[in-house]
Amino acid sequence: MNASSKRKIISQSEISKKIAVMNEEMQGFWANNSWDIRKCPHPSAIELSKNPALRNRWVRFERVKNLWLRTELKYFYFYHLNNGIWNAKTVWIRKGTVINKMLDFLDLKYPSITSITEVPIDKAMTEYRTYLTKQGVRITTTNYKITANQEKTPVKANSYYVTNLKQFIEFIEDFYFDGEEWDKDVWDRRNLPLPDDKVNPTQYEYTINFKGFRNTYFKQLVKRYCKLRLNMDSFSYVSDIAQKLKEFFNFLDIKFKHVQRVHQLTRVEIEAYLSELNMMGIKPSTITGRISILEGLFSTLHRLEWDDVPSKLLIYPEDYPKIPRAKPRFIDEFVLEQLNSHLDKLPEYIATMTMIVQECGMRISELCTLKKGCLLEDKDGYYFLKYYQWKMKKEHIVPISKEVVLLIKVREDKVSEEFPDSEYLFPRKDGSPLKQETFRGELNKLAYEQNIVDKLGEIYRFHAHAFRHSVGTRTINNGVPQHIVQKFLGHESPEMTSRYAHIFDETLKNEFTKFQEKLVTNNGDVLNLDDDSEVDDVELQWFKKNINAQVLPNGYCRLPVIAGGCPHANACLDCTHFCTSKQFLPQHEEQLERTEELLTIAKDKQWQRQIETNSRVKERLEQIIGSLTG
């Protein structure tokens, strides 16, 4: 069997038809064998051609004399340019000299083939690496990445010269594939009829890879199962299912070669696999996930009555490890202060995203897919942020401060000018939403470069979800009722929010004291936070669920921060929005003492207005102090 049939490539006659289709699509400028960027109709080429520093004007496909190969090459670049995958800069600048080397190699090495698919990809890549090395061209490049330990480390990768040929061969093999996308060993989500809610556009995960299975039968079984699961689950989760089942069945093939079908499985193999997992040193939650995926497969085989099903129950409840109650991975204020002091060193859009997520605590996918027009304003001038929750598959609305509103408005103006066709607040150059990895990468790069450290002096590693944990933990610890936090974060159940109801040892005593203290209004009335009628009060709801509640020198203002600065300077004691607690008692006693002194002077001098004002202040303070000490 030749290499082409192994890869399920269509017949030569069908390839000839495909070549004809390629030529039909490449009309006008694209039919030329030399592409001049100054004549290219692609919008990105028109813009790039105006750059006086542009050195590489031509892509000369005529260097390849083999007409079949030349057509495949031209179509490879034509397709990527006209389907939004690449822009002109990618072809004429990034791949400029790279293309010429590849064209010369193909013309030299394969002058007589009728398709690049006649050459096994491994053979072609080996020959090309040898060719480049003899030409004095580097076949690897060194990139640097920030590791999970916040260390900068070099990473070797194939150079553009090597990857360009690999991309070309894989593209043509895919184009000539004899079958549906489901028949391939690598499923590309862009070629599958998946609804939008199955695909998170903020992730780089484009494929589900079934290569690497040691047993072909089990590979086909897993492919069928994954196709079924795509009806219920997200693309990224099904990709994880495929990888975890590959690990299990490869384990079987290595340790229990005699097991060739699912119905041959016994507890012996399962227990050996569980032991293997436990010896890997992975977290209990990770082990639970792998067992759950395996049990899900076995359960589905039984329920849907597939031909090959387990002969007995293989997974028991006691197989699942006990998972410790997860503590919220909040970001310490010590770290946040450092981060915020260096926001100016981040790209403008990343800094804006950081401010939004610190206040609203949304998930990273929700942050990246914020859309233009996400601000809502009510009749009182208060602003709210509207965004889509990918996990819950629903729209969510939260109150937002005027400071962040201003940042969003500035960003909207900028994006509308630079990316008028994109609906997103933080788009990539192609108009799609920013990828999660870009946000995380920029924050951790900043932490490394600016030496943002934790209290132990270690460079801090930012995880996007930790901002959500920080908002949840901070609000719970500040006494906000759990059901309010649940609504603010958009949790479906109280259990999802309860993980934030954790006060850490360092602040346990102080937080408990704060929780127990009384809140008193300007009239000395006690606010009972557990009273249902008080909880339903609109102003107190705002006070509780506003993350950035306004703290005064002698108490709190129940007006939400979103309302802006108070126009009534030094009038808190006469304001119905004012409330205070026992921790401010010394300030009230000191103010009462000063007020009594001023009142004595006013009476001596018979300053009637000052007597009235200070008498009212004295009365308010006495009511407050009496309630706090009573």
Curated annotation (Swiss-Prot):
The lineage of its organism: Bacteria, Bacillati, Bacillota, Bacilli, Bacillales. The active site is at R363, K391, H465, R468, H491, Y500. PROSITE patterns: CB, TYR_RECOMBINASE. It comes from Staphylococcus aureus. Belongs to the 'phage' integrase family. GO terms for biological process: DNA integration; DNA recombination. It comes from the Bacteria. This is Transposase B from transposon PsiTn554. The keyword DNA-binding applies. Residues 216-302 form the Core-binding (CB) domain. Residues 326-513 form the Tyr recombinase domain. Keywords: DNA integration, DNA recombination, DNA-binding, Transposable element. It holds the Pfam family Phage_integrase. One of its GO terms (molecular function) is DNA binding. The gene is tnpB. The keyword DNA-binding applies.
